[in-house]
Amino acid sequence: MIASFEAPLATGFRVNTMLRDEDETIADLRAEGVPLEPVEGLPGAYSVPPDGRAALLASRPYADGHVYVQNVSSQLAPIALAPRKGDRVLDLCAAPGSKTGQLSALVGPEGEVTAVEKVRPRFYKLKANVYAQGATNVLPWMGNGAAYWRREPEAFDRVLVDAPCSTEGRFRTHDPETTAYWSGRKIREMKSKQVKLLWAGIQSLKPGGTLVYSTCTFAPEENESVVAKALRTFGDAIEVIDAGLPTSGPIADRAMAGLTEWRDRPLDPALERTRRVLPDELLEGFFIARLLKNSSTVGVGGGGMA
């Protein structure tokens, strides 16, 4: 895994099907000589090698907004969430809007995505991004994601909590900025936010609905530990289900089961169904947990997870 920090990273992208047909866009890219390859097991995902990035960014489909550059790992969470056409989806940590746009395309014009961001500059970046993608079914909301559940408790079919994190999965040795802000204190700070966001996400989810919790870090404190706390808080009202990732291809090859023990302490065995995606030339490091809500959680947890 350490060697992956030194490897040049392929450029992942998806076709913006809200603006143009996927097959037509891919045909145009190939005609312009863009050396793209589909990502096996992940519908709509493509990649170009490092030396093909310039050709992709110089292409007409990219200039027209028909191509959206997004690392393949970043595309996993919306795919795992698997929203249906017409679903109401809550994207609780939405900026800059990459996954928001992807979710918008998945639910279709009959669906709706509420996109939450509390930092003002990031909120306006989110709005501009989803507008550029043609995502007319997105409702941006500026405010604290940890408090949004009070506006619409148990109102959403699907909830994505792509939580802020210490970004260990994006470390690259040739780019000092990727490690500049990392510290043990940062991990503790992020965990505190993540616990509140996951609790709020669960409270926003309808009984019978699905929630995906994801990060781009390796720290168990920010991944399995956060999900374990939710399992202790909500008991049988929620359960960890299969992560919903591809079962073949490069993603399956790099996905490992979540930890069920950390620092000689056992964790909930159900965490084995979460997935850690290890980085390589195609993928950034990523963690995904998919939760099913079995029953109402109104009044559970006393306003947070202790």
PLM region descriptions:
Residues 1-306:
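S-adenosylmethionine
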